[in-house]
């Protein structure tokens, strides 16, 4: 695990974005941890969040032309990531996001920001069922662009309804890399290093044994 990944987990815990306990997911599964990126909700939080997304992008080595943030949660993520890439990596990247409802006046259309062209890096908070990615792919393809990859905050590394995770299904269906700032494996490593979280560690390991990929 790299330093920025460890720092991201600490940041998420500090902001209570990442919590350990017992949580019922939409799928009905009882999870020993929960991640709610909506709690990164101040200017300082967003600035820090962008730096972690930018670090993961730089670390990945994936080449892309435009950042795309799907409405709604992806919009501030794309914006802060673009700022962080410029400020901390000297990479001036165009960014774009979509409207849920197309605008019929002014500039019109359902896209805001740069043109959606070339190789697109999609940024979002998490992938659960992959629905948002599929909707975004329709927009990307309609503009004649290609999906270079997807970056999310956390990869839960757990099976969906079949044997694959939602992330693995996206990788299979769209032939692109899906990367994350951290994964469930990183969370487990973090808990092992902490040494004072045996209760949470055992619960997370048991969850991975049951649902992990």
Curated annotation (Swiss-Prot):
Pfam families in the cross-refs: Pribosyltran
UniProt cofactor(s): Mg(2+)
Reactions catalysed, as given in the entry: orotidine 5'-phosphate + diphosphate = orotate + 5-phospho-alpha-D-ribose 1-diphosphate
Binding annotation for orotate: 34-35, 128, 156
Uppermost EC category: transferase
Pathway entry: Pyrimidine metabolism; UMP biosynthesis via de novo pathway; UMP from orotate: step 1/2
Binding residues annotated for 5-phospho-alpha-D-ribose 1-diphosphate, in chain numbering: 26, 72-73, 99-100, 103, 105, 124-132
GO BP terms in the entry: 'de novo' pyrimidine nucleobase biosynthetic process; 'de novo' UMP biosynthetic process; pyrimidine ribonucleoside biosynthetic process
InterPro entries in alphabetical order: OPRT, Or_phspho_trans_dom, PRibTrfase_dom, PRTase-like
Gene Ontology MF terms: magnesium ion binding; orotate phosphoribosyltransferase activity
EC number per UniProt: 2.4.2.10
A Gene Ontology cellular-component term: cytoplasm
Keywords: Glycosyltransferase, Magnesium, Pyrimidine biosynthesis, Transferase
PANTHER family: OROTATE PHOSPHORIBOSYLTRANSFERASE 1-RELATED
Family affiliation: Belongs to the purine/pyrimidine phosphoribosyltransferase family. PyrE subfamily.
Function field: Catalyzes the transfer of a ribosyl phosphate group from 5-phosphoribose 1-diphosphate to orotate, leading to the formation of orotidine monophosphate (OMP).
Subunit structure: Homodimer.
Name the UniProt record assigns to this protein: Orotate phosphoribosyltransferase
